[in-house]
Amino acid sequence: PFSSGKVFLGLSGSDSNDTQYKLFTYANNKLGKEKKKKMIARKKGYHGVTVTSASMTGLPNQHKLFDLPQENFIHTETPHYFKEGKEGETEEDYVRRLSETLEETILDEGPESIAAMIAEPLMGAGGVILPPKGYFPAIQDVLDKFDIPLIVDEVVTAFGRTGNAFGSETYEIKPTSMTIAKALSSGYIPISAVIVNDELFEPIKEASGDIGAVSYTHLRAHETG
């Protein structure tokens, strides 16, 4: 989905989506954008089982009894045209309505407070929901308007599942960052990765010395790969 970038390895899609939240919080703090702490996800989206990734998830059964989602996680509408489209509403009109709803949500929350949006190219655990035609270009127009990056969760869709190498190609997505996992090892060993484009990496690369060595990324699965 982007020509060059940097990779941070992990063990699972859940922990890599945790890393996504940490990464964007870290980047915004280093760039003097400390107010950018909120993340937009979608109802019925699935991003993992840890506290942070489950907060991104838009499935109520993943929230009840766990006091989730945490603060700073917002959920916008599910792009399910066949179920949620109104009578007489075309697919194009439906996409327009969802993009307008997203813009209203951003304005209500305050664009200056939104760190990123995360989305699966097609929703897996939420019901295998394919986005309507033109959905991602439309919502990216809204995100670009407010300088909000898009994280694409390709744990389910990467490596050919949608007919292209990545679901981002199939659905015309231009992500700033991407999560991959299961298919990275064909499911044989636990491994995942966060891939960020150079536009995100370059401004913060010198700040990485504040963290020091990250032994968490020195795993046997990575050596095996």
Predicted features along the sequence, with ranges:
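Conserved N-terminal phosphate-binding loop of PLP-dependent enzymes in the Aspartate aminotransferase
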Residues: P1-R220
